[in-house]
Every structure is written in C-alpha cells, then in structure tokens.
C-alpha cells in the first residue's frame, strides 16, 4: 500500500512537471504562403523552426502555418504587424513601397547566386542602410533567390525582341519594368497560382529561379527554359516587434542566434543547392529544353535594360534615400561572393 501511494505521488508529480513545461512553452506562429511541401516551407522554414525549438529547450514552440492559411502573399507583412502571425516569411517586393532600398537586389544582372544576394542584403542591414524601412518589425533575416531565368509554356525565347506581346508573370515592380522594356505584357499572379495561370493561358511564361519549378509544379506546364540571370527578389523572415520584446532574454537570444547572416548564409546554401538540383532534374525531363543566352545576346539585354538602374537611383533620391551608396555596397559584397 505504501509503495502504491508513493508511486501514485511520483506519477502525479511527474505529470505536473510535464504539464507545467508545456504551459510555459511560448507558441510562435510562423506564416508563409508557400505550399506545405514546397522547398521553402518544408526545408527552410520548418528546419529553422525545429532548430529554434530545440535550442530553446522547450521554451519556444514555433509552428509553421503554410499555404497562406493565415494570409495570402501580399498580406504577410500585415499579418505580422497586426499580430495574426508572430513571424512570417515574405517577398518584400509584394509589399508596395515599404522596402525600397531592399529592392536593389532586383536590379538586372546584379546577382547570380542566393549566397551573394543574401550576403549583400544582410550586410546592408547590419551596416544600417536598411534601418528606416525595417523600423517597426523585428527582422530575423534576409535572403535572395538565385538569379531568375525565363520559363515558358509553348514559346521559346532567346533574344530581347522575342518577348513582344507575350503575357509574362510580374513578380515585382522592377521585374515589371524589365518585362515592359522587353515588350511583354505584364500580368500579376501570386507565385502559388503560376502553374494554373500557365495552364489556362493567362500566362505564356514567367521569370523564376529553378527552385520554384518543383515548389509550384512548373515542370508540368513549361518546357522551354532560357537562362539570362535577368533579375532577383528579396525575402525577409520578419517578426512582430512587440512579440519579440515580450520574450524573456534567454529566448530572445535563441532567436538572435538564428538571425542575420547565420540565417541568410544557411538558407542561401540550401537554396543554391536546390536550384542546381532542380535544373538537373529539368534537364533530364523529356521535352524540356534549357538554353543559355550567349554573351552577345546578354549584351543586347543589358543595353535595353540599362536605364532601369538610373531610374531606380532617381526614385531613391526622390524618396530622400541614398541609393548610390546602397548599390555601391551591394555590388562590393556580391562581387566578393559571385566574383
């Protein structure tokens, strides 16, 4: 009887401790519009959440809400600011006008790899260039994609003149300007809807890195892939500032230890590897054609698109921002990585 009573007390005590630990765990909702099985959601965000959870020793429980369940692509910034989500992974270019200097990475032919773009973005943030546009949120980290190539449904493109009249997806403001200067008709379609838009003929093609092909099943609706390194995009893992400030110092440190260059460099390594993997897979698919634009054709693109940089610098100047300094610093960092 005595042993039974002691066993009961120990069991109740253990259950109480477990319940207390669960009660003390702080849940953080991490939102993304990417499908649950897409590369970013499953290999970057879920892995980051697992790492933070493990390092917090149960103090944090980051849960990923994928597929836009907490808000669609253009709403990711708003749901973090409004507290619907605690953290969000978002395309900064989707949020009109909020992140002007961060759009430097979108300029034509600036980057080739995620490693270079991500290093440049986090360096710009560390050195204070992006302080104004990041005010009001806790920035966990930034990264870019590898350079965007053209992925087409039925029309093979190579020269700048080949785009005239084609319906092309516009992933950002600068990409829209690029496509307009090439004579294409820009169509705004959220990334998850690209495959369906191509299938229905709403789009003839889209600029995307190879990483997006598997995530959005583009291999089923495209067959021509032309490499030009035309543009890029800036992505941010952002957190509600009040939520971050409410955390105990030890849990803030866990977030901080997985932020900035640590996050950006780690994510970029995975992204560049996935880009190479998906390109190899596409190359092995029957009926798919990959073409690399030769240097003389690239020079034609550069000649047509050259005014975009000057226009961007003028736009930054009009906003009272030092675009010249940001572009110069971005180029320095990118050159140190991409060569």
Give residue spans per PLM region.
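Serine/threonine-rich, low-complexity intrinsically disordered segments
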Residues: 6, 20-21
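N-terminal signal peptide c-region/cleavage motif recognized by signal peptidases
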Residues: 14-19
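Bacterial N-terminal signal peptides that target proteins for export
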Residues: 1-8
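N-terminal secretory/targeting leader peptides
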Residues: 24-117, 125, 132-339
């Amino acid at each position: 009887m005595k042993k039974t009573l002691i066993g009961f007390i120990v069991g109740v005590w253990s259950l109480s401790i477990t319940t207390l630990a669960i009660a003390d765990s702080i849940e953080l909702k991490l939102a993304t519009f990417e499908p649950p099985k897409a590369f970013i959601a499953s290999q970057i965000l879920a892995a980051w959440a697992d790492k933070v959870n493990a390092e917090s020793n149960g103090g944090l429980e980051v849960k990923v809400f994928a597929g836009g369940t907490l808000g669609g692509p253009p709403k990711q910034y708003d749901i973090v600011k409004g507290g619907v989500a605690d953290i969000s992974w978002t395309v900064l270019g989707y949020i009109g006008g909020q992140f002007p200097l961060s759009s430097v990475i979108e300029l034509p032919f600036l980057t080739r790899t995620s490693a270079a773009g991500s290093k440049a973005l986090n360096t710009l943030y560390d050195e204070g260039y992006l302080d104004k546009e990041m005010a009001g949120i806790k920035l966990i980290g930034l990264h870019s994609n590898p350079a965007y190539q053209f992925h087409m449904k039925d029309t093979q493109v190579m020269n700048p003149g080949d785009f005239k009249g084609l319906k092309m997806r516009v992933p950002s403001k600068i990409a829209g300007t690029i496509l307009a200067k090439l004579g294409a008709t820009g169509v705004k379609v959220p990334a998850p809807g690209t495959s369906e838009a191509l299938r229905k003929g709403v789009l003839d093609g889209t600029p995307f890195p190879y990483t997006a092909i598997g995530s959005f099943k583009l291999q089923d609706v495209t067959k021509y892939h032309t490499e030009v390194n035309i543009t890029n995009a800036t992505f941010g893992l952002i957190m509600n500032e009040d939520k971050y400030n409410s955390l105990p110092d030890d849990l803030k440190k866990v977030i901080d230890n997985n932020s900035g260059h640590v996050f950006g460099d780690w994510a970029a390594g995975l992204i560049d590897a996935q880009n190479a993997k998906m390109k190899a897979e596409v190359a092995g698919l029957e009926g798919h054609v990959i073409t690399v634009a030769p240097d003389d054709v690239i020079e034609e693109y550069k000649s047509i698109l050259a005014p975009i940089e000057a226009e961007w610098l003028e736009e930054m100047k009009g906003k009272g921002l030092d675009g010249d300094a940001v572009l110069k610093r971005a180029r320095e960092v990118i050159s140190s990585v991409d060569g």
